[in-house]
Structures are given as structure tokens and as C-alpha cells.
Amino acid sequence: MVSTLVFILILGILVIVHEFGHFIAAKKSGVRVEKFSVGFGPKIFSVKKNKTEYAVSALPLGGYVKLAGDNFEEYKGAPDEYFSQPIFKRFRIIFFGPVLNYVLGFIFFWIIFCVGYPIITNKVGEVMDGYGAKDAGIIAGDRITSIQGKSVKTWEDIQQTIQENRINPELKVGILREGKIQSLSIKLKQTSQPDALGQKRRLGLLGIKPDLNETIIVRHGVFQSAYFGFKKTVDLTVMTYRALWFMVSGKLSIKDSVTGPVGMFIITSEVTKMGIIALMNWIAVLSVS
């Protein structure tokens, strides 16, 4: 029940923000906005101001904006109607919907980086059979402190450094065990796996998994958080348009790459259990994707 309500709330936020973008651009362009509704269906209540009816409706599944003369059947040629505007103004009205979604995503990412987010540490939780780490003697509870001489403090550092050195057959790995630093040579297993866009990527694997029960909270200053928030927004945007290009060009299956409403609901249900920061991150990802 809670997951359903959260899912409806998220969809509502995304749609309302999108429609509010159209609303702002229409007002700035001199187009008469006949109605701005939060929700669909029967009206619960409404007020009218400056020729615009503001309504709250019964079905909380987003909302909509009704512009004067936004279809040819109703178009009368009045100067404040949608189709009376030059094409650049009409484009601006359409464009501002997704722009405001991007702004929402950026703001949420910015807040997350400011408030703090959990990062998995460098502690090993599991060592897998058949990989170099097991053969070299790494055990659960060890901390990976360095790879190829580069200091690593989080699991993300470990993954990134391994991939930077994935062409090497062996890696020099520093570990902390019972207060003592040890240096091990670990064979790297070469493999390839599909990335987020379904493209094959060469990977190097040590055969270790993190201890998911140990995390640290990472926070950044306001300006640094703004930079990281902007960067994450741009990165997700690039990934989204790359995926669209791959789908159009036939390099990526639409079925395998597009998550439908059921998939979104399942992900939302899982994210809801992880707390407000994870939920904000999910909303931001949806907003810019």
C-alpha cells in the first residue's frame, strides 16, 4: 500500500513539474492559460485568477495545462492563442516542460550531495571461488587499501581503479588485516559484460564483493555539490540520448532497454525501503531520463 502511494506521488510530482514548465513558458509568451489542474477527473475545488482556472481534481495521477487555441478545432485566431504565436514561442512552450524536469533532477542531486549519501567502504564482505583474490589469500573482513600503488577508500574507488588497470594480468593490492598492512599480487580475471546500454565492455575481476553492512556518509559543500549535481544530470542525459540513438540505429533492443510502468513500480517499491535519500535519487534519475 505504501509503495503504491509513493509510486503515485512520484508520478504526480514528475508530471506536475513538467506541466508547470509548459505553464510558465505559456504565460511568458503571452498565451492565455485556460486551466492548470493538479490531478485529473472531477474537480474537488478551483479558483480563477487572471483568466486562468486553477483546479485540484480527484485523480492524483499528475496534472495538465489547457492552453487557449492549442488545437485547430478550437483555434479562433485571437492574439493570445497558442497557434497565433510564432513558431519559436510555440517551441519554447513545448521545450520548457522537459527543461523543468531537468531542473528538478539537478536540484534533487544537489540536495543529496549537500545532505550526504551512503558510500560502501573498502571492506571485503565475500571472496568468490575461482578468482585471483581467493588464490592470493584475501578473506572476508580484509580492507583493500591500495591497488597498483593508488590509495582506495571506498568500493567505488576499488572498482574504478581495477578497471583503469584491467589490461594488466596481475595487480599489486594492499590490504589491512588485524591492524597490519600486507601487499599481495592478485591475478586479474579478464571478462566482458554488457554495460547499461547493452554494449559489451571489457572488465577485470578480482573476485571480491563488498560488505554492504558498512557504509560511510559523504557530504560536500554547497558549490561542490552544485557541480556534482550538474555533472550527474549531464551524465544521465548523455546516457539517455545514447540509448535512444542505439535503439533507433538497431544496436539496442527497445524491449531490453525500456522499463515500463510495472518495472518502475517494482524499483520504486525497493527504493522506498532504502530511505528518503535513495527515494530522492530515484526521482531525480526519472526526472532527467
Where are the model-predicted features located?
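Small-residue-rich helix-interface/hinge motifs
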Residues: 2-76, 288
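Generic alpha-helical transmembrane segments of integral inner-membrane proteins
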Residues: 4-8, 12-16, 20, 95, ...
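Internal alpha-helical transmembrane segments
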Residues: 59-129
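Functional transmembrane alpha-helices
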Residues: 81, 85, 128, 193-289
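PDZ-domain C-terminal substructure recognizer with occasional recognition of PDZ-binding tails
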Residues: 139, 145-146, 161-201
